[in-house]
Amino acid sequence: MNIEQFTAALEEKGITLSPVQLEQFETYFRMLVEWNEKMNLTSITEKEEVYLKHFYDSISASFFIDFHKVTTICDIGAGAGFPSIPLKICFPHLHVTIVDSLQKRITFLNELAKGLNLQDTTFYHDRAETFGQRKEKRESYDLVTARAVARLSVLSELCLPLVKKEGLFVALKASAADEEMQAGKKAVTVLGGEVVEKHSFVLPLEESERNIIVIEKKKQTPKKYPRKPGTPNKSPIEG
């Protein structure tokens, strides 16, 4: 996906990028590739692939959710900033918090935020399990997202405690979303959520399947969740 295709594809979805925003994406690409040489941020470094599989894919959540109605967003395990930084570029009013367990990725994100001149972005070097137990962070975000490879049952335990009541947890998944939703049903309910929508679509050009699972927070998450680091992954809430 070259820049013209990227711009046109977003235009079709009602997102018009200014010259400043296009420049931010260019800088993002440049910094990603530079920093990737000293640390492992991504295996995707070819420009057209980055624009499709990282930038466009990250922004796809906004095709189904109105981000103009969202103010605070928390991204769990964002790695090199996906999906929240591309969303922040498109929707500059967002207040973005990223939590990642690797200090070197946080170092990159801090430099990236400076390079892109982003306001209202905060990065925490922490495990999602311990971050989710911080009193001032629990139930405090309009929207929590993850584009991670962990199963939905695991992601729900890491993300739902941070979502405010009536807020959303949005999981960006590749294929196999139906099986994950089935296995994750119990976790979603126990943690106070309810699956309200699932959107399936194909990425343009390469036509690989993508799914966006939208979970609404209906009631408070019990205090014991998330459990201690490593536990959600070792023994997910499934049954």
Swiss-Prot record:
It is an enzyme of class 2 (transferase). Its main location: cytoplasm. Keywords: Cytoplasm, Methyltransferase, rRNA processing, S-adenosyl-L-methionine, Transferase. It is found in: Cytoplasm. It comes from the Bacteria. Residues 216-239 are annotated as: Disordered. S-adenosyl-L-methionine binds at residues 77, 82, 128-129, 147. The keyword S-adenosyl-L-methionine applies. Coiled coil: none annotated. One of its GO terms (cellular component) is cytosol. GO terms for molecular function: rRNA (guanine-N7-)-methyltransferase activity. Its EC number is 2.1.1.-. The keyword S-adenosyl-L-methionine applies. HAMAP family: 16SrRNA_methyltr_G (MF_00074). Belongs to the methyltransferase superfamily. RNA methyltransferase RsmG family. Specifically methylates the N7 position of guanine in position 535 of 16S rRNA. This is Ribosomal RNA small subunit methyltransferase G.
